[in-house]
Design a protein with these regions (language model features):
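Hydrophobic transmembrane alpha-helices
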Residues: 50, 116-123, 166-175
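Alpha-helical transmembrane bundle and helix-membrane interface signal
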Residues: 55, 120-135, 175-188
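Hydrophobic alpha-helical transmembrane segments
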Residues: 63-67, 110, 138-143, 161, ...
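C-terminal transmembrane module of polytopic alpha-helical membrane proteins
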Residues: 146-229
Length: 229
């Protein structure tokens, strides 16, 4: 089980560090996991969803969707950390639950794949579609994962929701491109739009950070001293 110090050194997302100094953590945190069980659960889900999604979307769109979903998960997680810091200042009482937390894992990207398959299952089947997707099973699995995120502490549900929203959005664009039979160019444009949305949310988060920058700098300095970073 990696320590908090190890997680920070290996690229985990910690909002004050990510937004004040190292934005690459939005990406690198997708590949770090908190122990073997965390890694195995996400890789099992990636195998289940990914093996179908790659064959449906093609390799390029599959990879693009996966990365955009993971980034959106990290960004929405950061947005929630920002809102918690606003609440911490407004409350005037030190509440540990509102402090930024270290987060990592591929679950946002994986949930994006799950959402993409769920959306496809709910839409009329395309003539060229190679798989019949079980909508009841997919809705149940995705709903259960979301519910567990709200019921169990320590799960970054904001990352899950961000990944799901991006996965659903890019799947709708892919579906439209298949109906129009202009898949290659339209798919590239769709991925660029997805990435642009990530950039916009990142810029929005940077704007929101300005009023809480002194607080985050203080929190970051305290963590660096405690962990001897």
């Amino acid at each position: 089980q990696p320590s908090t110090r190890d997680a920070i050194l290996w690229g985990a997302d910690y909002a004050p560090l990510t937004y004040l100094a190292e934005p690459m953590r939005l990406f690198s945190s997708m590949f770090f996991h908190f122990g073997l069980i965390h890694l195995m659960l996400n890789m099992w889900a990636l195998y289940i969803f990914g093996s179908v999604a790659e064959q449906l979307f093609g390799r390029m769109y599959f990879i693009g969707l996966y990365v955009c979903a993971g980034l959106m998960g990290s960004l929405l997680s950061g947005y929630m950390n920002i809102q918690d810091s606003y609440n911490l200042i407004e409350g005037g009482v030190a509440n540990p639950d509102l402090l930024p937390a270290v987060s990592a894992g591929a679950s946002g990207a994986v949930m994006g794949l799950g959402a993409s398959l769920t959306v496809l299952a709910l839409l009329p089947m395309l003539p060229q579609q190679r798989f019949i997707l079980d909508k009841k099973t997919l809705v149940m699995v995705m709903g259960l994962n979301l519910a567990l995120g709200f019921m169990i502490s320590g799960i970054n549900n904001a990352a899950h929701i961000g990944g799901m929203l991006m996965g659903a959005f890019l799947t709708l664009l892919w579906y439209i491109s298949q109906k129009m039979q202009r898949s290659h160019l339209f798919n590239l444009i769709a991925l660029l739009v997805g990435f642009a949305l990530c950039v916009l949310l990142y810029q929005h988060n940077l704007t929101l950070i300005e009023p809480i920058r002194p607080l985050w700098q203080e929190i970051l300095e305290m963590m660096q001293q405690q962990l001897k970073l």
